[in-house]
From Swiss-Prot:
Changing residue 216 to E/K/L: Yields insoluble protein. This is 4-chlorobenzoyl coenzyme A dehalogenase. The active site is at 90 (proton acceptor), 145 (nucleophile). It comes from Pseudomonas sp. (strain CBS-3). Induction: By 4-chlorobenzoyl-CoA, 4-iodobenzoyl-CoA or 4-bromobenzoyl-CoA.
Length: 269
């Protein structure tokens, strides 16, 4: 179905694998188009409860695939290529944020530039103890993109975001966890197995409630508290009229759900 990415649906999880390992899984324009299409398919597939984005072999994603830049076409050709690339990057990032499924970034290696942007746009992020994070844009002389000016400071705070961007330093897993870039760190050798376990847990949870939470948290960043609480009321009313609600309430009142977490995550390192 796809040429530039890996894709499969299993156990309610749509796995999207960025696969250009000889270039640390940098994303071509075609790959971005395919990731966006795969996200659209996941949203339309009732059997899919969660999406997992990861990278082939030992890297997550090193950003834009620079080797397809048409240097022989001069400044105008390079500019046009970056304009097209930025448009597709941003369509893909928008879809990760807006897709009506929880998205897990399973960061198995380097996440640089746009790869960092993908991890920030995802709803949850976990990483292997071999991962590393770096802004990287200034290394190649370009401004940051992939909505990092929207997401990075929101997740790690303005001071830390500016430190990462201005110094271009590499962040390693434990510090990334401490800063909130990822929620958990797992050993490299077990990472794919654990990532699939987390994704399956997300997929098994009630999709309509996951989507409500996702939409509310993103909207809440931009809205006054009064608007947030009004939408929360609407979500509560919608959720209690859903067929999922009454069995859950009955179990809870009978004492069967009081201490049961909705999604169980493996302990990290």
């Amino acid at each position: 179905m796809y040429e530039a990415i890996g894709h499969r649906v299993e156990d309610g999880v749509a796995e999207i694998t960025i696969k250009l390992p000889r270039h640390r899984n940098a994303l071509s324009v075609k790959a971005m188009q395919e990731v966006t299409d795969a996200l659209n398919r996941a949203e339309e597939d009732d059997s899919v409860g969660a999406v997992m984005i990861t990278g082939a072999e030992d890297a997550f994603c090193a950003g834009f695939y620079l080797r397809e830049i048409p240097l022989d076409k001069g400044v105008a050709g390079v500019r046009d290529h970056f304009r097209i690339g930025a448009l597709w990057w941003h369509q893909m990032i928008h879809k990760i944020i807006r897709v009506k499924r929880p998205v897990l970034a399973a960061i198995n290696g380097v996440a640089a530039g746009g790869g960092l942007g993908i991890s920030l746009a995802s709803d949850m992020a976990i990483c292997a103890d071999s991962a590393k994070f770096v802004c990287a844009w200034h290394t190649i002389g370009i401004g940051n993109d992939t909505a990092t000016s929207y997401s990075l400071a929101r997740i790690v705070g303005m001071r830390r975001a500016m430190e990462l961007m201005l110094t271009n330093r590499t962040l390693y897993p434990e510090e990334a966890k401490d800063w909130g870039l990822v929620s958990r760190v797992y050993p490299k050798d077990d990472f794919r197995e654990v990532a699939w376990k987390v994704a399956r847990e997300l997929a098994a949870a009630p999709t309509h409630l996951q989507v409500m939470a996702k939409e509310r948290f993103h909207a809440g960043w931009m809205q006054p508290v009064e608007e947030c609480t009004e939408f929360e009321i609407q979500n509560v009313i919608a959720s209690v009229t859903h067929p999922h609600f009454m069995p859950c309430l009955t179990e809870f009142l009978d004492g069967h759900r009081a201490d049961r977490p909705q999604v169980e995550l493996p302990a990290g390192v």
